[in-house]
Amino acid sequence: MLIAITGTPGVGKTTVAKLLAKKLNYEYVSLKDFALEKGCGRRVNDEVEVEIDELAYFIERELKGKNAVLDGHLSHLMPVDLVVVLRAHPKLIGERLRERGYDREKIGENVEAELVDAVLIEAIEEHENVIEVDTTNKSPEDVVEEIVSLINSGIKKRVGIVDWSEVYDEIIPYLRLGGE
């Protein structure tokens, strides 16, 4: 089974994806590294720009039928069996991205994306099997246990469990000023 771990930057994708792969004894695949290795991604400043259709082709050709956890912001756009959309309180995302040195504009974009469910909506538009998991106030290990429990119970769709509309006032500073 191919499992995509996706979400807004700062939700904990890489940590959770690595732990989940280990727990399930699946291969861990960083989409950025995979794209660079296959020649369908290139470094631009601090980011990797990816040709999505080419990347999907290589995923289909080289990973379909294998057990792997795909880690990356674009993993929900790949041909996978299950998409896990990680969510986190927008204020927490703003704080994490500020600690990573993101500029104000990038922090604002990502906080807004989390606020309006951007990644979740894209995932639902692309796939039938989508599970949403709120990582706020949970350890990565607890998040992995929740994902494994959902998979083992046969749940293939669980969305709509997160609603950040009530915290809008808390995150206005991140939208306007990058958290300052």
UniProtKB/Swiss-Prot annotation:
Please list the residues that bind ATP. Answer: G10, G12, K13, T14, T15, R100, K138
Query: Region annotation NMP: residue ranges?
Result: 30-50
Locate the transmembrane regions by residue number: none
Q: Which UniProt keywords apply?
A: ATP-binding, Kinase, Nucleotide-binding, Ribosome biogenesis, rRNA processing, Transferase
Top-level taxon of origin: Archaea
Task: Say yes or no: keyword tRNA-binding present.
Answer: no
Q: Does the keyword Lyase apply?
A: no
Under Pfam families, the record lists: AAA_18 (PF13238)
Question: What's its catalytic activity?
Answer: AMP + ATP = 2 ADP; ATP + H2O = ADP + phosphate + H(+)
Q: What is a biological process (GO) this protein takes part in?
A: rRNA processing
> Where is the region LID?
99-109
Identify the EC number(s).
Answer: 2.7.4.3
GO MF terms held by the record: adenylate kinase activity; ATP binding; ATP hydrolysis activity
Q: InterPro entries from the entry?
A: Adenyl_kinase_AK6 (IPR020618), P-loop_NTPase (IPR027417)
Extract the SUPFAM superfamilies matched here. P-loop containing nucleoside triphosphate hydrolases
Looking up HAMAP family in the UniProt record yields:
Adenylate_kinase_AK6 (MF_00039)
**Record note on quaternary structure:** Interacts with uS11. Not a structural component of 40S pre-ribosomes, but transiently interacts with them by binding to uS11.
Q: Describe its function.
A: Broad-specificity nucleoside monophosphate (NMP) kinase that catalyzes the reversible transfer of the terminal phosphate group between nucleoside triphosphates and monophosphates. Also has ATPase activity. Involved in the late maturation steps of the 30S ribosomal particles, specifically 16S rRNA maturation. While NMP activity is not required for ribosome maturation, ATPase activity is. Associates transiently with small ribosomal subunit protein uS11. ATP hydrolysis breaks the interaction with uS11.
The Swiss-Prot or TrEMBL record describes its family as follows: Belongs to the adenylate kinase family. AK6 subfamily.
Q: What is this protein called?
A: Putative adenylate kinase
